[in-house]
Amino acid sequence: ETDLLLDDSLVSLFGNRR
């Protein structure tokens, strides 16, 4: 169940790119 952790990381990066 590390999908959430990975998602968080991606979201952080994507959010920054936004």
Swiss-Prot record:
The modification Phosphoserine is found at residue 12. This is Peroxiredoxin-5, mitochondrial. Thiol-specific peroxidase that catalyzes the reduction of hydrogen peroxide and organic hydroperoxides to water and alcohols, respectively. Plays a role in cell protection against oxidative stress by detoxifying peroxides and as sensor of hydrogen peroxide-mediated signaling events. Residues 1-18 form the Thioredoxin domain. Belongs to the peroxiredoxin family. Prx5 subfamily. Its EC number is 1.11.1.24. GO terms for molecular function: thioredoxin-dependent peroxiredoxin activity. The active site is a conserved redox-active cysteine residue, the peroxidatic cysteine (C(P)), which makes the nucleophilic attack on the peroxide substrate. The peroxide oxidizes the C(P)-SH to cysteine sulfenic acid (C(P)-SOH), which then reacts with another cysteine residue, the resolving cysteine (C(R)), to form a disulfide bridge. The disulfide is subsequently reduced by an appropriate electron donor to complete the catalytic cycle. In this atypical 2-Cys Prx, C(R) is present in the same subunit to form an intramolecular disulfide. The disulfide is subsequently reduced by thioredoxin. Monomer. Keywords: Antioxidant, Cytoplasm, Mitochondrion, Oxidoreductase, Peroxidase, Peroxisome, Phosphoprotein, Redox-active center. It comes from the Eukaryota. One of its GO terms (cellular component) is mitochondrion. It catalyses: a hydroperoxide + [thioredoxin]-dithiol = an alcohol + [thioredoxin]-disulfide + H2O. It is found in: Mitochondrion; Cytoplasm; Peroxisome matrix. The keyword Phosphoprotein applies. It comes from Mesocricetus auratus (Golden hamster).
